[in-house]
Amino acid sequence: MEIKDIERSIIKKYRKEIWSPFIKALKEFELINDGDKVAVAISGGKDSLLLAKVIEELHRHSKVDFDVEYICMDPGYTEENRDRLEQNLSYLHIPGKIFETEIFQIAEEVTKGEYPCYMCARMRRGALYSKAQELGCNKIALGHHMNDVIETIMLNVLYAGKYNTMMPKLKAKNFENMELIRPFYYIREEDIIKWRDYSKLSALDCACKVTKSEEAYTRKMIKQMIADMKKDNPGVEISILRSAHNVNCDMVVGYQQNGEKHTFLEEFNG
């Protein structure tokens, strides 16, 4: 497929499913502003590859004056996966800057191979922040989509006993003046898959052998649970997402703010 057709499809064929919700998130959450330099983090998966193309289109046509870099971290890919990453960058005409780390190996050694996903994610995030800062960027864009957000909400409620969501943007704790943004906050995974298939793209899944062996079991359970609920309630995904926008602190027993715990008794006893 011609690259011009792939690029055009983002704004034309998939305007309703991809471009419009992307623009909605940018405006609603003020994700990209004049003077920003955004590092698009590309793992080689479908989400980050589409994110790179969408932000590329924005950079070409938007009135917002910002700069962009495309960074690709190799956390220890096999030769086959590294080759596929490079092929996808070439196929999509993405000028990605690849840099190497040993994160897969370190995460597996530290956790002794038992569910290293959290450790791996934190290390990858730190490496991306460092590279972005080195390139003079003030923001990192990640490809987390709407389904990632709602699955995170449900994981926290059902497995951690707390209400935490995946925020559309965050300030970095350990990297001064750096922010993380999630422009795909309103985009469904099924629509990203449609674009991937239309574009005839062979994207990477998580290339970690430990994750493959454990199959990210808990998150897959949550994904299946939501799919089952959707059969009876087609709007369940939107309802879960909206719950993070409609928390009524007058109707919760306890909550935290700035690391400090509060209870309803503070107001009740006035």
Regions from the PLM with identified roles:
Residues 74-76, 102-104, 172, 186, ...:
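Short, solvent-exposed coil/turn elements at secondary-structure transition points
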Residues 1-5, 267-270:
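Short, low-complexity, intrinsically disordered N-terminal peptides in bacterial proteins
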Residues 121-133, 169-175, 226-243:
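Short, basic, helix/turn surface patches
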Residues 12, 16, 49, 79, ...:
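Electropositive phosphate-/nucleotide-binding environments in soluble metabolic enzymes
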Residues 67, 148-221, 225-228:
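Catalytic subdomain that performs nucleotidyl-dependent activation
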Residues 116-121, 142-144, 185-189, 230-232, ...:
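A general structural signal for short secondary-structure boundary/capping elements
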Residues 201-270:
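The feature marks non-catalytic terminal segments
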Residues 2-155, 159-162, 167, 190-198:
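ATP-dependent adenylation/nucleotidyltransferase module used to activate substrates
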